Amino acid sequence: MANDNVSDYANAAPFARFANLQNRETLNPIGNEAKEIPYNRDQYLTWLAEGKLFQIGALTDAEIVAAWTTIKTAMGNNTFSETHMRSIVKIACNLRGITPGSTPLLVTYNPPQSATWAPAPSTDAIYSGTPVAGVIIPQNTGAGGEDTETEASKARAIAFICCYLLRFIVKTEEHLTNSLGNLKLQYSRLYSAQSATLSNWNPSNTWASRVKLGFDTYLTLRATVAYNIASADALLVPENVNYGLCRMLVFQHLELSGLQLYKMAMTLIAHFKLIEPNKFLSWIYDPLSEASIDQIYKIAVNYDNVNSKTHKHWKYAKLARGQYWLNTTVKRNQFLAYILADLELKYGLAGKSDYSSPKRMKALSGMPVERMTEAETISKAVEQMYTAIESAKRVDAGAAYRLAKKLGPPRANAHSRRKEPNNSRQHRDKQPNSKQQGRDKRNKHQVLGRHSKPQAQGPPNKQQDLGPHNNKPKEASRPPQQDRQQLAQPWRLTRRQRGARGHRTQTLSGMFCKGTCQCIQ
């Protein structure tokens, strides 16, 4: 039997025997549920200085080429270790810029006096997936081969590859297959040059899986990348010719890692240009999502603004310390994540393929279908509200848009009337126009009746004498009932009668006289 007072039961006071368990904050995390650490820049940098970073220095072209040969050999004979992973990071930070002689990712680290460097790397082999049987490098002869490529060109291509490998801190192995072709194309466009070293690099997925496992295993790798990339991001400005190179290769892939909810919300806010950011957050606000939405708001206000250009560590800190920004992860709030993902797809802000669709995120894989459907109704409501705002802005849209939306033809003076002074507009509105005069004439015709005859002008006759001895005019003789109906409703006449009377049908709303009957002219 259904009970309509479920809320009364749900809000009943807990038993007194459980009085000591009122605060959830006193509980330890259950399973692998981590507890969030509030982000603080100074505390974060102090934590990094406690043996989390290894030294990064400038490398010559010859040193880069020699280190790359060692990396390929180790990958081929299954001895790839943390030592080789550090070499990849060092080469990546020596990325050659588009401007000759520039290294945009190489920054100077000034550690505090109490700082300590990370210990020596491990030489234990990193095994992931199937062992690499050997890395096949095509043997090239003649022009265009690696044998004829200059050392500077090789070093530039190798640093480009190693910088690309940094993506696997956050990317899966499938990213290698899906992006390698475009990577080679982007190299040619950015540097306006070709490289046999890059063209001949066709690794298997084992490369990606081992690099990813190395980043997952060793904190010092992730921390060093997070610090150097954040520092370089703060130094580069969009006007710098190297900014696009670094953003394409690494910035856009590593920034806001683990802050998916914030990233999706900011993408939608940037798209919804007709409303302010606070209105969008108000639209999607849900008390059950309060922690996530509040964190989105705090990040936008305190960190992600034009006044914090020199501070970019907050964007990459989660790479090194995963306990930051937990409330903006998809796992913490699947419902809000699905709403934002659905909105991104509605407005074409994300890919629709299985690989790129935000609805295909691994953290959403176990979400119940009922909750997905409910989230889609919320995103549909957001779409409807924004469409209403768009329609209001398009009140003076052009003819093509109005025709497509069935809004009627545009007003010729719509824009000029908005700029017209009020006194001029009021004066113009008081002047009768031809359309208004026509409407007044038709209204007069309807009041008198289509087939009623107006009173003749001139002195009143005896029947019309309204003197004191005859206060009531004599009633004129009236035609029979049937004739009165035909006069009042001429469409009831037969075709022959209409022809005799001279009527013709113009519209369904009434008849127009040719002048042979006694109509008002």
Swiss-Prot record:
Record carries keyword Transmembrane: no
Major place of residence: virion
Family in the record: Belongs to the nucleorhabdovirus nucleocapsid protein family.
Identification of the protein by name: Nucleoprotein
GO CC, alphabetical: helical viral capsid; host cell cytoplasm; ribonucleoprotein complex; viral nucleocapsid
Segments of skewed composition (Basic residues): 441-453, 493-504
Gene label: N
GO MF term set: RNA binding
Comp. bias (Polar residues): 454-464, 479-488
Subunit comment: Homomultimerizes to form the nucleocapsid. Binds to viral genomic RNA. Interacts with movement protein 3.
